[in-house]
Amino acid sequence: MKPEVEQELAHILLTELLAYQFASPVRWIETQDVFLKDFNTERVVEIGPSPTLAGMAQRTLKNKYESYDAALSLHREILCYSKDAKEIYYTPDPSELAAKEEPAKEEAPAPTPAASAPAPAAAAPAPVAAAAPAAAAAEIADEPVKASLLLHVLVAHKLKKSLDSIPMSKTIKDLVGGKSTVQNEILGDLGKEFGTTPEKPEETPLEELAETFQDTFSGALGKQSSSLLSRLISSKMPGGFTITVARKYLQTRWGLPSGRQDGVLLVALSNEPAARLGSEADAKAFLDSMAQKYASIVGVDLSSAASASGAAGAGAAAGAAMIDAGALEEITKDHKVLARQQLQVLARYLKMDLDNGERKFLKEKDTVAELQAQLDYLNAELGEFFVNGVATSFSRKKARTFDSSWNWAKQSLLSLYFEIIHGVLKNVDREVVSEAINIMNRSNDALIKFMEYHISNTDETKGENYQLVKTLGEQLIENCKQVLDVDPVYKDVAKPTGPKTAIDKNGNITYSEEPREKVRKLSQYVQEMALGGPITKESQPTIEEDLTRVYKAISAQADKQDISSSTRVEFEKLYSDLMKFLESSKEIDPSQTTQLAGMDVEDALDKDSTKEVASLPNKSTISKTVSSTIPRETIPFLHLRKKTPAGDWKYDRQLSSLFLDGLEKAAFNGVTFKDKYVLITGAGKGSIGAEVLQGLLQGGAKVVVTTSRFSKQVTDYYQSIYAKYGAKGSTLIVVPFNQGSKQDVEALIEFIYDTEKNGGLGWDLDAIIPFAAIPEQGIELEHIDSKSEFAHRIMLTNILRMMGCVKKQKSARGIETRPAQVILPMSPNHGTFGGDGMYSESKLSLETLFNRWHSESWANQLTVCGAIIGWTRGTGLMSANNIIAEGIEKMGVRTFSQKEMAFNLLGLLTPEVVELCQKSPVMADLNGGLQFVPELKEFTAKLRKELVETSEVRKAVSIETALEHKVVNGNSADAAYAQVEIQPRANIQLDFPELKPYKQVKQIAPAELEGLLDLERVIVVTGFAEVGPWGSARTRWEMEAFGEFSLEGCVEMAWIMGFISYHNGNLKGRPYTGWVDSKTKEPVDDKDVKAKYETSILEHSGIRLIEPELFNGYNPEKKEMIQEVIVEEDLEPFEASKETAEQFKHQHGDKVDIFEIPETGEYSVKLLKGATLYIPKALRFDRLVAGQIPTGWNAKTYGISDDIISQVDPITLFVLVSVVEAFIASGITDPYEMYKYVHVSEVGNCSGSGMGGVSALRGMFKDRFKDEPVQNDILQESFINTMSAWVNMLLISSSGPIKTPVGACATSVESVDIGVETILSGKARICIVGGYDDFQEEGSFEFGNMKATSNTLEEFEHGRTPAEMSRPATTTRNGFMEAQGAGIQIIMQADLALKMGVPIYGIVAMAATATDKIGRSVPAPGKGILTTAREHHSSVKYASPNLNMKYRKRQLVTREAQIKDWVENELEALKLEAEEIPSEDQNEFLLERTREIHNEAESQLRAAQQQWGNDFYKRDPRIAPLRGALATYGLTIDDLGVASFHGTSTKANDKNESATINEMMKHLGRSEGNPVIGVFQKFLTGHPKGAAGAWMMNGALQILNSGIIPGNRNADNVDKILEQFEYVLYPSKTLKTDGVRAVSITSFGFGQKGGQAIVVHPDYLYGAITEDRYNEYVAKVSAREKSAYKFFHNGMIYNKLFVSKEHAPYTDELEEDVYLDPLARVSKDKKSGSLTFNSKNIQSKDSYINANTIETAKMIENMTKEKVSNGGVGVDVELITSINVENDTFIERNFTPQEIEYCSAQPSVQSSFAGTWSAKEAVFKSLGVKSLGGGAALKDIEIVRVNKNAPAVELHGNAKKAAEEAGVTDVKVSISHDDLQAVAVAVSTKK
């Protein structure tokens, strides 16, 4: 047959086949059999877009004809036009053609073996070359890029994955995972690259798709790939490294032709660097690695090319090394000369001096050398330590002011109150008395009211602790009233202590401070000091000795003068009487202690400390002063000296008496320092100065204290001192200061005296205590160095300079009558110890001031008081000597504690001593007799040596004994006694709320609450979570409440931040299960996590300097902006792709030239004069700090896939994690479990955001403008509702309401409000609420422009660290601190929560939002939220009865009785209705009508509960929404314990919010003295905008369930302006209370958004349900907690906390049916174990009519069938809640013992009693006898249950008698009940 005939027949056949297929039924199986079997066709070709029929034919061949073809040796081909064009047209492969041409190219002779030998050396040097050229690599055969590689790269690039992770066997649809937008992007890119695409390419495997493209692919890169490569080169390569350069390098380095270059560049595209490469070398290295990858993909060997290139390069290098340097110089000499001449000519033309810079440089060099020489000289002369030491550190801006004693007084009281209640303080000891004194020192009217409220509301019946706190409180109130107008005093009641050194049997030396036996208080201490000791006794004769000498002299004189015997006798008698008198006289008895008028000598404090507190305000009158007890012959341990004419300072009894009497008064009655202005230096922690500072503040002084180590820790220390001791009127100002700096000394004094207007204090000093010093140890004369000189400068020179500056300031202001008393720190160490540098000289030199006071002109401005400070234990200088202090005291010397020495020094500030100083300088010896110890240094050395020797001997004996013991008893003899250290293990808990015993709940909640509320209208929080700067809600709470992480907190944070991961398997060859370090893979034990990672955790969590890696490289120090510039001259050309070049031309027109580069196909672009450029510039922005999520936080850690992470905005990831954790906190491990209880339409999402996906917005605007790669569907990620959409798509699959609030900073509270409204409206039963917002540079910059945020640079200038830059409510607050994160709560109906058994963290009693007034400022704070306290008062005398819960309960009971009657009537009426229905339909009728009656009864009851329980206050102008919300649960406005403030740390907000809360409380009649405790969470977290209210809500729930109220630890000083708000307390430390009933959360957002929510403790919900229901709920929660705990820990271990859903809980077929059946519920699939909807359960009758309904209908049906013409029927309905099973009298009166036993054993005791009671009532009604009244007992009617038989009736007593009289022979009864009611029907039969 001719070919043309065959072709024509084939055409006809094809046409007929197609016509047959279109026109006839498909009979493809038969058709296949015809051409495969009948005709044995070997080549089948399908004409179509995809191999559909071909695929079927292949399957048919495999299944049916495989053995058939093998038998006949048939080889068949199944081809498709769309993919097998080459095979169909027999097109040869290009590689085959190349292979045929190859032999022709191999005509050149093969290289001989000799070619490998080295070439002979050249006879002469080669010509000099400029550089060694890079040798070209051996070229590799070219091959165009294949479509498969191009397709592979384009898909991988779009999916942001590596080539290895994109299998070519998968389809595009599979790879995108359902992301339609990404799929569309890929298809668009493919169309742009390859032109046309086959039909449905997304469903074709990539390898098949590549083959399809290859047929029409030219091998050249298309538009898309060229554009991507151009972008890669321009954005990631270094400047000048163009695509031409890249191609040239690939050609020369690797010998790759253009096609191969395309392949390498494509591979590079799929491995794009994260950031621009820094240098050309980096770019080449990158290309090298890409070339190797390409070679491995296509199977090319690059080694030969590389070796050829390397060898040639080496040869070139060798040639270059042989160049003659001299010849090169000779050649280039003339060029250099010519260039220099041209340069000089141009300079002369431009009138420039080329040597001017050189001359200036030489001059500057000489100047620098001279300055350096001076510096070197100063360093050599003064020493490095001295030069560095004098650096200035003072700054006015860093001054910290503490003066809010009014607030700390209340805080101290509350702390004391709760410490006693919690048993921390079990009795009133010295510490409590001291705290009482501090409180009295701060007494004011507000404080007294505060105490009166708390003490009057203390319930003594709760236990001894409450009794103690009430007794102490009442005493303290009286004390404060008495001292209300009295100046504060310094009074120390601590027990004086002494040194105690002990050496145990093992030779360990221990030192401790022990109370002194005979000195129990400071008054006795003063007495001890006055008495002195043997060592201080002077060598003066006693009175007796003097009298004896007088007696002897008179006797001798009498003998000479012959005195009469009578006179002698009289004289002898007189002498004898006088001696007797001296012996018995108490006037000079040194052991006699001070006598107090009206007081016992015995220490009252040791007998009864509560009485001591009561006596504190009483001033003691001293009848006999301590000075009168000073022995004549003894010098007191403390005394004043007077200068003798000889210039010595000697003990002066009179002055000392004055001083000691003053100390005594201070010890008994305290001493005030009110209106004293004091400067003190050297008052660091653990110093004498710090104790002096405490006393000054306690006495009401205003003090400036300096510190040389200014830091947050130091300022916190001083703040804690002020908070504890600061009395009313006192002020503490802390400043950085270097006493070694002259500038600092001058600046400090100027700051103190300068006016407030100029930034100074405007003070005039009354006292200066310059105690600053540095230790000098081991420095003898030959080692005097710069440190000694610097110390001398601190301790002498600059003390004098400081005094001089004060004198200068006083003189300048004309202050002549108010001299400042300078307490000079003298020392008894006048070289006694030695080896202390210039310490002794510094102290001795201060004594010159005593003379200069008289000789110079500053006596009117300064007075001098030298204090010789004795041995003071525990200070920085003396702590090493503590162990020998006891030995020193055995010598008779008195050493001192820091408190004792501070007391001594403060005694020098008493008015008596101050007055002495104004007359003449005073020298106070506070040495304790140390100066009387001879050879002190040798003695102390001896003491130390003895201690060490004793220690060593005992240690040796101990070791010897132990060895002997082991020898005798064996090595394991002590094993049983060995100490075993239990290693802690982390156990992260979910912190489900504690569920108290029901009786305890009923003691908390009012009894009337039970059954009062419609629980479907009570909204509860069942779960909450967050992602924030401190990780999760658990870890944030640890840091907020306790200020540190627990072991569990550290483990969780380390896991969150990626420091550790869990390992279960072999590790280094051994099985290991536990945590490992994520980097090293080394095991990490739980106990080591805190020590190993906590520092890093704290550094990279919370509020900190912005970390650029978290924000796309954003560095506020280099905030990027662009500026438009017009090109003034033509620029150098650069390379670009054709497409880019054309775009430049399109924009700039004739201002740009573009030309093609023929070699590469790229374009040269040249910008001409007049073109416009946008040039980046960097701005130094001043907002450098933010609250950032922990570094290392990764959504993948929680189980979120890379696909989702790459697709969504980061804020969406925060939300997804928060929602999952909130569900886990709810005990819900599978969100589909909700659909077991509710319909899919009843789960809503009301979470929202202030700005939404700001990263997406940034991509849309900034990145897109910069033409950076941005996903095409970025728009969808910017929508604020997208986050909620992802939650639904990945987790919950609900079809309920979705509402997206946008309320700026008030979004979260608005979300709660909307969620509550959504549930109350019936649109949902469960809602996800919360808020979220991100931090990005754009928002940060704009907030900064508004001056709303904290200026970091200013904060640094003020010495603030990032952690303390958010300081709500403080004097220095200066703007809010931005943060990022998400917060979520799960809220639902209380009734549903109880049924599900989920934990209930709190009740949302109220949620509201409000706007403000007319204005022009969007962010201005307002008070619109005050409307939640709106309440009409006018002249209404009595409160609304609706506020009385008993009244409301009474109304509800009445209404319940009506409902009961209605149900009974309706059920009885059913009998008549049923008679009208055909008998075959009666059962159905009764079922439906019974259900309707039940529904209506339930509806009526809920309406009644709603009216009298939930909504009684609504629309009542006399009851504020806030008051009504609390009253719903039996609470009053006084029960609102905590207010969580929005507290942004801005001046305006904190004042406005405080005023708003204060006015609410005041208007609603909150009791005076009962402020709400303010919580300011943002001090820790910063301000996350949309998430703010959610985090506050989480914190409020944690407060409710723990009773712990976190303090605002950044509140170093509360603003004075806030003192006016009496109903708010601002604590700075955490308070552990005995319970919090309710918490308010307020939130304010830009745009007139104000919001408030009230959450109430869940105990008040439990009080509203029955005990049975509560116990059932407790069991459910317990089970749920266990499963949630297991799920959570497995999730952490395996990184599976987030488990995304792949499918909805219903099939596509059931989707519409599920939506349309509100009673559709999921059930567990037996095969898969998953929760799904089953078609059997949709529109099922069982889901509407339950078993109880069937039972009730059956009873009614039986009733209708009974023939009761001679009998009676009784129907009774009882609400379950109406039976009070707690009333024992009611139970025993109406139920028999058997009935009680039966009912009590049932799962629902109350329901069983209700059913039994209902049966009794029904029986009575069926008897038809006369009632004995509503109060008649029904015990005579007994309902008997035998086994599981139906209940029977037995009548007794009066009931039996009445039945017999009525002729009743039998009674039958039926009972049914559900959660709402019990129904009983009784039928009686008569004779």
Swiss-Prot record:
Its EC number is 2.3.1.86, 1.1.1.100, 2.3.1.41. Residues 145-220 form the Carrier domain. The active site is at residues 1305, 1542, 1583. SUPFAM superfamilies: 4'-phosphopantetheinyl transferase, FabD/lysophospholipase-like, NAD(P)-binding Rossmann-fold domains, Thiolase-like. Changing residue 1770 to D: Loss of transferase activity. Changing residue 1769 to D: Does not affect oligomerization. Residues 98-108 have a biased composition (Basic and acidic residues). GO terms for cellular component: cytosol; fatty acid synthase complex; mitochondrion. CDD domains: elong_cond_enzymes (cd00828), KR_fFAS_SDR_c_like (cd08950). GO terms for biological process: long-chain fatty acid biosynthetic process. Residues 675-874 are annotated as: Beta-ketoacyl reductase. Acetyl-CoA binds at residues 1772-1774, 1798, 1808, 1817-1827, 1841-1844, 1871-1873. 4'-phosphopantetheine is transferred from CoA to a specific serine of the Acyl carrier domain by the C-terminal PPT domain. This modification is essential for activity because fatty acids are bound in thioester linkage to the sulfhydryl of the prosthetic group. Present with 17000 molecules/cell in log phase SD medium. [Alpha(6)beta(6)] hexamers of two multifunctional subunits (alpha and beta). This is Fatty acid synthase subunit alpha. It comes from Saccharomyces cerevisiae (strain ATCC 204508 / S288c). The gene is FAS2.
